[in-house]
Amino acid sequence: MGSEMCIRDSPGLNHVSFEMLNIDDVFMGHEILQQKKEEFDYELEWGVGRHYQGSQIFDYWRSPFKQTHEHQTDGDMLDNSVPCGHINMIENTGGMPGDAPGPSQWGPPINLETFGDKRGV
């Protein structure tokens, strides 16, 4: 998981990210977009889930213009008592031994056929 998440064939904007106050705001936004998706042509891209890197709670949507935007919030507090972890996005490994590979700790799987495609460019 690395270059597969980039826009294919040409440079461009992958997505815009908005930091929310807390997990409640991420889920509230998810519910609102879910309710309005037919009326305003929103499309769920990926989420709700938790990223390995940074541990943010995330939710990705396509706007009516097909650009991808992310709502995310900090998922934890790290200090020197938390051991360092290693994640290799190129080899698609990370997390705890025995975990299924992928770019998130939990949540639905990412659709690599559509994530980062040219619809919103």
Short names for language-model regions:
Residues 1-7:
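Short, small-residue-biased leader/transition segments that mark boundaries at the very start
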